[in-house]
Amino acid sequence: MKYFYAFLVLFLVFSCSPEKKGDPLRFKFGTFEIPASDNYGKTVIIRKDSLQIEQYTKKVSISTDSLVTEKETTKIDTLYIKWKNNFAYSLRMKNPKTDLDKDPIFVQITKVTDTSYSFTARIGYSNFKQKGTVYKVK
């Protein structure tokens, strides 16, 4: 009977361990995707060490006197990524082209699933916030 209680206690202890389903560490390295939005095409993100490389297409309107056309251009940005903790990181452009590019981007992870995370991002110290979802590809 003594062994039965010991087994029961051990079983309860190990069966109540927290589930690692929402572990955010898997989002620190790898290839990710942000789906297309109104002005941007799909963004592909590659994270290695302290670098994040983003490739995306941007829609640009070109207007002449009588005609307005849209053109998609492919852009690649390289950013430094610094993790504050498992749910917050900041991004800084490696080669900023404008004053706005010099401001850091603060990202807060708000929800984690098996294959994605939702985030809220803020550029610099402004009140403007952008929300989105990042999907892990590999």
Could you tell me what each predicted segment is?
Residues 118-131:
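Short, exposed beta-strand-loop hairpins at the edges of beta-sheets
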Residues 13-15:
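C-terminal motif of bacterial Sec signal peptides marking the signal peptidase cleavage site
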Residues 43-46, 77-82, 104-111, 132-136:
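Hydrophobic/aromatic beta-strand elements that line small-molecule binding cavities or substrate pockets
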Residues 24-42:
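Tryptophan-anchored aromatic micro-motifs
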Residues 42-84, 125:
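N-terminal glycine/threonine-rich, aromatic-flanked beta-hairpin/loop signature
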Residues 1-4:
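Positively charged n-region of N-terminal signal peptides that target proteins for export
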Residues 17-19:
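Bacterial signal peptide processing site
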Residues 91-112:
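An anionic, turn-rich surface loop/hairpin at beta-sheet edges
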